[in-house]
């Protein structure tokens, strides 16, 4: 297999083309079926989280260890020299990358991962989320989960629900799935609609999409229902209660759904998916979170091995 991801920075999902996305999905499936504990032997990966994280950090660190590698790093950026002594991000990255083979980071500042890649001593930087900008490895695990449940990525009907304006996961996933000719349904309050630049990109590619204000309008057409949280703090109490009734998923909402429908969510869930939905055959968000390990194993293996 030709591996064009070897020694590559992974900053934005748009850094990867269709063939590279398919390669990560394939390798993730291979590693899920047949674990390989030697792919990161004698490799050290920095896990540097300047912002709180549970699933992303733990799944990355699990991925490194399952592949036979070693992890160093921190999960509280407030206790680093950068925070305590005024060290610049550029200096911090330059020093830490001199110790390791790859540098995984999360940072609250948009563009921090791209900046880090400029000072990484040529070591690959993997973006674990930079502010509201990009979260490419979430998109990779989403793609793997979609492929796992549908057997394909091409031509699917996918709805995004909730906070589409600020949600970095939906922006990246829409961009990635547009490479596979998917049809999109954007279900959100007007104040949290999908950003214009995403819609313009889809228009330029000839991708079909439509805007909706309730899940019930389209649930019977969908292959994938991608839920996100509508943040209460963005609305007054009366408006939020009205929004909540339209953008909370329960069993009744799923009446008429196709058998192959699967519900995804980047998590954490608050109250936008009723607990009762967990027990339906449509729920796939916990398996999706587990798939984060395999998608990140695949990415690390490809970035750190010329051939696998």
Curated annotation (Swiss-Prot):
One of its GO terms (biological process) is amino acid metabolic process. It catalyses: carbamoyl phosphate + L-aspartate = N-carbamoyl-L-aspartate + phosphate + H(+). Its EC number is 2.1.3.2. InterPro entries: Asp/Orn_carbamoyltranf_P-bd, Asp/Orn_carbamoylTrfase, Asp/Orn_carbamoylTrfase_sf, Asp_carbamoyltransf, Asp_carbamoyltransf_Asp/Orn-bd. GO terms for cellular component: cytosol. Pathway: Pyrimidine metabolism; UMP biosynthesis via de novo pathway; (S)-dihydroorotate from bicarbonate: step 2/3. Keywords: Pyrimidine biosynthesis, Transferase. Gene3D superfamilies: Aspartate/ornithine carbamoyltransferase (3.40.50.1370). The keyword DNA repair does not apply. It comes from the Bacteria. GO terms for molecular function: amino acid binding; aspartate carbamoyltransferase activity. Carbamoyl phosphate binds at residues 55-56, 106, 135, 138, 267-268. L-aspartate binds at residues 85, 168, 229. Catalyzes the condensation of carbamoyl phosphate and aspartate to form carbamoyl aspartate and inorganic phosphate, the committed step in the de novo pyrimidine nucleotide biosynthesis pathway. Heterododecamer (2C3:3R2) of six catalytic PyrB chains organized as two trimers (C3), and six regulatory PyrI chains organized as three dimers (R2). Belongs to the aspartate/ornithine carbamoyltransferase superfamily. ATCase family. PANTHER family: ASPARTATE CARBAMOYLTRANSFERASE (PTHR45753:SF6), ORNITHINE CARBAMOYLTRANSFERASE, MITOCHONDRIAL (PTHR45753). This is Aspartate carbamoyltransferase catalytic subunit. It comes from Laribacter hongkongensis (strain HLHK9).
